[in-house]
């Protein structure tokens, strides 16, 4: 996107194809800007499994052919937002398969806290 046009509200955006240089005008009533879509997961230990794009795998994304992730030490499946390391949970844009945005991240965070308490209650 190279330009937002309108008077008292957004009416149109100009989009540029970075490969061809072509610019097109698209009618619009709103613009959602997603900045920094690269997940910041480099600080995590290597045992936390990530996708090729760096998104953290959790829950069912870790299951392969109905089996728990390799090295999973517990006698239960991973919780929905639990990573390949028991007790480490991922929420928001860093999680593989998430719907990017504040509302989704907030919901993930709330659910992760609940799952963390569930994890702690097992001790």
Per-region residue spans from a language model:
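A conserved FAD-binding loop/helix module that cradles the flavin
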Residues: 74-85, 91-123
């Amino acid at each position: 996107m190279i330009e937002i046009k309108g008077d008292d509200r957004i009416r149109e955006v100009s989009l540029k194809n970075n490969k061809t240089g072509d610019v097109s005008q698209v009618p619009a009533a709103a613009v959602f800007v997603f900045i920094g879509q690269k997940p910041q997961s480099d600080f995590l230990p290597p045992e936390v499994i990530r996708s090729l794009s760096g998104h953290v795998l959790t829950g069912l994304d870790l299951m392969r052919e109905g089996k728990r992730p390799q090295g999973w030490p517990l006698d239960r499946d991973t919780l929905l937002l639990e990573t390949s390391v028991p007790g480490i949970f991922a929420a928001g844009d860093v999680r593989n398969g998430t719907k990017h945005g504040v509302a989704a991240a907030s919901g993930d965070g709330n659910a992760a806290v609940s799952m963390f308490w569930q994890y702690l209650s097992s001790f």
